A protein has these predicted regions:
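His/Asp/Glu-rich mid-to-C-terminal helical/loop segments that flank catalytic regions of hydrolases
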Residues: 245-248, 252-256, 263, 340, ...
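Metal-dependent peptidase/peptidase-like ectodomains
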Residues: 111, 131, 156, 166-168, ...
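Noncatalytic luminal/extracellular "stalk/propeptide" segments of secretory-pathway proteins
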Residues: 24, 50, 54-190
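Second-shell loop/turn segments in exported
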Residues: 32-40, 54-64, 120, 124, ...
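Short helix-loop-beta-strand segments that form the rim/entrance of peptidase-like active sites
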Residues: 47, 188, 341-366, 389, ...
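N-terminal capping segment at the start of a domain
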Residues: 27-63, 236-243, 317, 393-399, ...
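Soluble metallo-hydrolase cores and metallopeptidase-like ectodomains found primarily
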Residues: 30-31, 122-146, 151, 241-325, ...
Length: 520
């Protein structure tokens, strides 16, 4: 009901016969109204999201689920009328993985349930194992002297790694949140990292790998851990190793809920013997170790501008404990809806509109980074390819399913007043913030690195960080479909405006820096 009321108000704002800001940006209000009407009356977002989540399943890069989702997207875009819809290889990645059997339970001091999930690319237990649990800290895993001293304690055990996980304390804050006007005014840089920060963690990661290899050599049967501070059975599941063709074979590993983690620790601390049964049977897919993005286009119609490109996208890959609904089937669904909407309205963009659904984002934005290197050049060396100069902009969506409240300009002062004008017709939808602050850690960073304007939208967080992000709860039921429809309206308008304006969007100076996630 609220969306309908907001739409009615918007008609008043967009009812002018001429373009707004005629002395600056030429905004086609009639097209904006068509986009709104079509999306609110005939959105296909619910069906698109359903196919990417419930039907496709989890979407680890190179897994059957990713291929199901990508194939459906390619075939759907062909049916909608887009051109050149296809999987495009971007380079060497590694193995796919999918779970075939999994079970975990407490067997002593009594039989009971444990909420847990296998880490993606975990090795197999080769049937159910049943063993005592031995507790050790993350720091001890990297202490070779301590490890050697406790070799006999480790042998034949399931190891519980203790970490920074903290017990849930009720804080009486709502799990879901919309940004207030005061928060939008003060919005900070978000998820921004440089290469030095990323490089700092790489030796630490290698030490953990080495420690787990030593556990295996000492006879440890498996590893259990707990990642994060979630409660209510919500389990955070991700893994940074195991997918490369030459990855070492580590002990089987699963992640368990904070409640079960602390229960086991309390039992061990009191001297109770704790035994766990664990079965992990996964399947590795290594016939094709290249990875693929999904690409399609709406061809430009202007004889002069049709070779220039406006890009939009989001990553299609996810983690394995759920179906990756808010991260990032939501963003992928919105972007698919945008191109479906624009093509169905036969708007005839002057520039070519190209959508990209990326793979390998969760491991280090590999899909977009390699796509940019393959097509546009190297931002570190400054050796750029001819196509780089033809890309006006890339728009990204990857912060959950909340409605768009604005856009990060990533320090691009020249583009800020342009976006402010483009957003003005959508103030009634709650989108009005245009900030020079930056958002990082997702695929637009690849374009920025190569000197191409790349932007992430500001979205209401809802329960993205509190419940769904990289967890077993990231399912279709947490999607806010009306919010996603609002996002599709705004992204479609931005993409269309970029495709028809006389000039390419303004660029920042190329910095010539190492890609932030190089080496991951």
């Amino acid at each position: 009901m609220n969306m309908i009321i907001r739409f009615s108000l918007s008609i008043f704002l967009l009812s002018f016969t001429g373009p707004l800001f005629s002395q600056r940006e030429m905004i086609d209000t009639a097209v904006f109204q068509k986009i709104r009407t079509a999306e609110l009356n005939s959105s296909e977002i619910p069906q698109i999201a359903y196919h990417l989540t419930d039907v496709s399943g989890s979407r680890l890069t190179n897994s059957p689920g990713f291929k199901r989702a990508g194939t459906w997207a390619v075939e759907s875009m062909k049916k909608w009328g887009l051109k050149n819809a296809a999987f495009e290889p971007w380079g060497e990645y590694g193995r796919g993985w999918d779970i075939e059997e999994f079970g975990i339970s407490l067997r002593a001091p009594y039989t009971g349930y444990i909420i847990g999930y296998p880490l993606p690319w975990s090795s197999n237990t080769n049937g159910e194992i049943h063993a005592s649990v031995y507790e050790m800290a993350d720091g001890q895993l990297t202490d070779s002297v301590w490890m050697e001293k406790h070799r006999q304690d480790i042998s034949g055990k399931i190891i519980l790694l203790t970490s920074a996980a903290t017990k849930h304390e009720e804080d009486f804050k709502a799990n879901s949140h919309r940004l207030t006007d005061s928060e939008l005014v003060k919005i900070p840089d978000t998820y921004v990292y440089n290469h030095n920060q990323i490089a700092f963690i790489l030796p630490m990661r290698q030490r953990l790998i080495d420690g787990k290899m030593k556990l295996k050599s000492f006879g440890a049967l498996a590893v259990l851990d707990c990642r994060g501070t979630y409660s209510g059975g919500t389990v955070f599941v991700q893994n940074s190793t195991g997918f490369r063709a030459n990855s070492p074979v580590l002990p089987p590993e699963a992640t368990i809920s904070t409640e079960d983690y602390f229960r086991i620790r309390r039992l061990l601390a009191s001297g109770e013997p704790v035994e766990v049964a664990l079965n992990i049977k996964g399947k590795f897919y290594s016939d094709d170790t290249k990875a693929y993005n999904v690409i399609a286009e709406i061809p430009g119609t202007d004889p002069v501008l049709k070779d220039q490109i406006v890009m939009l996208g989001g990553h299609l890959d996810s983690w394995n404990a759920a179906t990756g609904a808010t991260d990032n089937a939501a963003g992928a669904s919105v972007m698919l809806e945008v191109v479906r909407l624009l093509d169905s309205l036969q708007l005839k963009p002057k520039r070519t509109i190209r959508i990209a659904l990326w793979s390998g984002e969760e491991q280090g934005v590999y899909g977009s980074y390699n796509y940019v290197k393959n097509h546009f050049g190297n931002g570190e060396t400054g050796v750029l390819k001819p196509e780089q100069s033809k890309v006006s902009v890339y728009f990204n969506l990857d912060d959950g399913c909340g409605k768009i409240r604005g856009i990060f300009c990533d320090g691009n002062t020249a583009v800020k007043p342009i976006f402010e004008q483009w957003l003005t017709p959508f103030r009634d939808l709650g989108a009005q913030t245009v900030t020079l602050k930056s958002s990082g850690s997702t695929d637009h960073v690849s374009f920025e690195w190569a000197g191409i304007p790349g932007f992430q939208f500001i979205q209401d967080p809802l329960d993205y960080e509190s419940i769904t992000h990289h967890t077993n709860m990231d399912t279709y039921d947490y999607l806010k479909l009306d919010d996603m429809k609002q996002s599709a309206i705004i992204v479609a308008a931005f993409v269309y405006q970029a495709s028809i304006r006389p000039d390419l969007l303004p660029r920042k100076t190329l910095i010539h820096e190492i890609f932030p996630f190089e080496g991951l």
